[in-house]
């Protein structure tokens, strides 16, 4: 009948509307879930960029926020869906209530699962970030030492051994400790010094991997039997805070390594028996302040196996040396550049190397022998060449002294300048006073050229 057809049409329309509302609810759920995941992703990204000290706290907060947001979204969606169901029921008595309730249940289930997934992802990423940025703390308390990670650091009496690459922070005070980086470590190690004071102690890396010592706050290490800091490979000493590090040894060098880089830090070095800095291949000092008192050489860079190795470069730094033997001695090139200030008081030569290149800053030398000495390749103690991997015929640098921009002042008991090769002054200033009768103010075996600058030579 016509009434039956009308009733059937109304039921069909109500069913269609219910389907549309279910679709809308699912779409809303999808959008809400997407927003939740996006929020979690953004939170995770922000968390990754924070410092390591607050990573765990921030990430936990992110996880909690994500969960709370998801719960609130689920509750809101449930309420809105419930209200929609009620309105639909009131307006159209033929609508199936059970269909709306099923849709609501599915929506809540989807949101709950997505919130759980988001929390799981955030927690997993948090654990990964923490693992990558972990710093093991080694705390010295007088006669005891405590480490925050016994799997990477072992303590045997007064011997502390670092067994894995990574970052380690030393704090506290102690005496008679030996900190060792095991030779089995193949990747770089960073040791942070945070106000640590160690007496009769040393840091030694037996690994060929790079060792970085980062001074967080003023620290000191003194040794009575070893090099205060020694590295079999490359050693870098730096500070992002402008802090100072005091190193001393009564029996050996203050610092010994294959190569040494001193960057943006203040170093006070004392050796009562040997050198302030002793390196094999190279020493680089930049943006730093270095004070050295040494019974032997202030800085020695000598490679007995390679005639083109053994270099020193000082850039934009203040270096003060008081040495019983030589101030600075290298087997290859010695360069002072930028806005550097180098002051040397030496019992023997002030500066010594094969090629001495002074292009910036000021250099003040007081020497018991030659002020500046450019010499043929030999080692300090011997001219034996049996261990060379190349030969003296492979020399790349000429034997020479080049002054081009620096201001150099010399007071010497020997020769003011002594070059077994050439002497060239292109710009800058050279002031030389020489006191002994048997030597010269400027002595060279090759060619002497003054093409610019100012030269004063007073003496023989």
Residue map of PLM features:
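A composition-driven surface/loop motif
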Residues: 1-37, 46-49, 55-59, 68-72, ...
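Alpha-helical and His/Cys-centered functional microenvironments
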Residues: 63
């Amino acid at each position: 009948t016509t009434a039956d057809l009308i009733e059937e049409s109304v039921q069909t329309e109500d069913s269609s509307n219910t389907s549309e509302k279910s679709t809308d609810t699912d779409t809303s759920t999808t959008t809400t879930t997407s927003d939740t995941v996006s929020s979690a992703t953004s939170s995770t990204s922000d968390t990754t960029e924070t410092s390591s000290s607050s990573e765990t706290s921030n990430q936990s907060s992110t996880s909690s926020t994500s969960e709370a947001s998801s719960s609130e979204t689920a509750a809101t969606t449930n309420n809105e869906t419930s209200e929609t169901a009620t309105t639909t029921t009131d307006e159209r008595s033929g609508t199936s209530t059970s269909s709306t309730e099923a849709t609501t249940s599915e929506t809540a289930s989807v949101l709950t699962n997505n919130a759980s997934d988001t929390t799981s992802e955030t927690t997993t990423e948090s654990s990964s970030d923490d693992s990558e940025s972990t710093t093991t703390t080694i705390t010295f308390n007088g006669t005891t030492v405590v480490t925050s990670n016994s799997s990477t650091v072992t303590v045997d009496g007064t011997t502390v051994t670092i067994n894995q690459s990574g970052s380690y922070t030393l704090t506290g005070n102690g005496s008679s400790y030996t900190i060792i980086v095991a030779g089995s470590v193949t990747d770089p190690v960073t040791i942070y010094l945070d106000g640590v004071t160690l007496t009769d102690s040393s840091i030694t890396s037996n690994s060929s991997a790079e060792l970085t010592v980062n001074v967080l706050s003023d620290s000191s290490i003194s040794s009575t039997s070893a090099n205060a800091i020694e590295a079999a490979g490359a050693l870098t000493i730096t500070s992002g805070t402008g802090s100072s590090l005091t190193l001393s040894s009564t029996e050996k060098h203050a610092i010994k390594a294959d190569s040494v880089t001193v960057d943006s830090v203040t170093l006070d070095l004392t050796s009562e028996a040997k050198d302030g800095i002793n390196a094999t291949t190279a020493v680089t000092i930049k943006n730093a302040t270095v004070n050295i008192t040494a019974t032997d050489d202030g800085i020695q860079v000598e490679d007995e196996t390679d005639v083109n190795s053994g270099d020193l470069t000082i850039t934009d730094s203040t270096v003060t040396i008081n040495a019983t033997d030589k101030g600075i001695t290298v087997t290859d090139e010695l360069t002072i550049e930028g806005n550097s200030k180098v002051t040397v008081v030496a019992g023997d030569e002030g500066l010594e190397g094969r090629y001495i290149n002074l292009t910036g800053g000021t250099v003040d030398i007081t020497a018991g022998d030659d002020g500046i000495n450019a010499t043929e390749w030999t080692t300090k103690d011997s001219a034996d060449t049996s261990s060379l991997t190349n030969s003296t015929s492979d020399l790349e640098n000429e034997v020479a002294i080049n002054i081009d921009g620096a201001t150099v002042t010399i007071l010497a008991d020997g020769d003011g300048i002594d070059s077994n090769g050439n002497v060239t002054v292109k710009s800058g200033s050279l002031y030389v006073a020489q006191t002994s009768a048997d030597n010269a103010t400027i002595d060279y075996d090759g060619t002497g050229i003054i093409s610019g600058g100012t030269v004063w030579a007073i003496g023989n």
